[in-house]
Amino acid sequence: MYEPVKSLGQNFLSKPSIVAPMVDALGIANGEDIIEIGPGHGILTEILLHRVSGRDVKVYSVEVDERFAKKLFGMYASEPTIEVVHEDILKWLPTFTSDRKVKVLGSLPYYITSPILHSVVKMEVMPECAVFLIQKEVAEKVCSKAPDASYISTFIQTFYDAELLFNVPKTEFTPAPKVDGAVIKLTRTTVEMDRGTIEKYEGFLHRAFSHPRKMLNKPFSKEELSKGGIDPKLRPQNLSPEEWLEFYKVLHSAASI
């Protein structure tokens, strides 16, 4: 058993009873590529293997820690379904391409949850579905709805329906983190955007939520709000992702959306 590296945010699960429902929630089908983020000791990888063995499914297990990558290479060297990738997930995701449906899952390091979520949305092939174990407070924020929306919930829910599946107590991890976790499921909506437009939309939402407790006449001009048919007395958390997207389209005439 390798010692966890604190700088990599490593906290490991050991019970199949927790990770098996994550794999089941992904709804794996033939002809799909599965990306596993941070396999560590391989507990999730092993369950994935049992679910996909003998099927037309490819699993990419992406691990940044050389120790675990070597261990997994040894475990799955003769298994054609599993490809172990020794890479930083934030550098690898933008390079991944596929002509098949893509799904993603993993127990994410809490300290890079937001960058990973953003990277998933900006992938060349946006995943059909994602199942992640993340910090409970962040999970609740990602799944929040108007009038309690946030920047991250609005951004993610423009492209995905977000559902909190179940909580995972911190005592289920080794070493135990300071906070509890929760598993979320993201299911693709019909919204289509290229990466460049997504980044512009991301900047637009950052502007909108730069003063979350202020009314919308703070980040936007009277003319902009009037053009979008937006009540200037509302606050950013009052609008749904659909309303934000329509407002963005009006202001940017985004024909590519």
PLM regions and their residue ranges:
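C-terminal lobe and adjacent flexible extensions of AdoMet/dcAdoMet transferase-like proteins
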Residues: 188, 207-257
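Catalytic cores of RNA-modifying enzymes
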Residues: 1-203, 207, 245-246, 256-257
